[in-house]
Amino acid sequence: MHLLWRLLVLLLGLLALPSALPKQPWPGLTKAHKDGRSTLARIIAQGLLKLNAEGRIQSMRLLDRLNVSGTVAPGMVGWLIGGMNFQQQQEISINITNVQLDCGGIQMAFPKEWFSANITLEFDIEFKLPFNSNIIKTHACMGLTAESWLEKDEFGRRELVMGRCRMEPSSGGASMSTEETSPKMKHFLHNLRESLGKVIPNLVESQVCPLIGEILRQLDVKLLKGLVGACS
């Protein structure tokens, strides 16, 4: 009788066991979902840092690009340097400083194994003009999207395909803000900002997009598949 009672207690304990388990078995999957995205974003961010993406952007020669025909407001550069001697022309400078670049997140789509890296970029632009003793500063905030996916070849092997890599339509000059300047400079700076808004996105794309492709191609396809699959 004592043995039968012990078996009955054990049976009741086993029947009660499922109720003690978590009702939702997804916490682990949720963690993997977050980890897959964050790991890939971290790999891209660290890769951009290692490949000196910020330094490349900071060294872009904006003034040279503005002097290329068709990239500036009509007559702007001519108006700027037309009444200057050679020494004054040499004093003109447009420099990028305080570059901050990061991978802000990863978007994914299934079952196509497609993912998109969202790159955030901020920097200051400093203007030094011979007829103005102060350094004029503007601030730019931009976003760049780089698309990629894994595609099977005729033998069923996956390979990385790089898609579009471009600045977001709302990026560029639209997000620039200028510090207070004299009325004499406002019209010139307005035209200059518009011109930079046309020039900078292409320059940034030419510097950052090849680096993202280089970073992703260095990853083992199985590792990349695992990161993407962790979020499915």
UniProtKB/Swiss-Prot annotation:
It comes from the Eukaryota. GO terms for molecular function: lipid binding. InterPro entries: Bactericidal_perm-incr_a/b_dom, Bpifa3, Lipid-bd_serum_glycop_N. GO terms for cellular component: extracellular region. Disulfide bonds join C165-C209. Glycans are attached at N67, N95, N118. It is found in: Secreted. The keyword Secreted applies. Belongs to the BPI/LBP/Plunc superfamily. Plunc family. This is BPI fold-containing family A member 3. It comes from Mus musculus. The gene is Bpifa3.
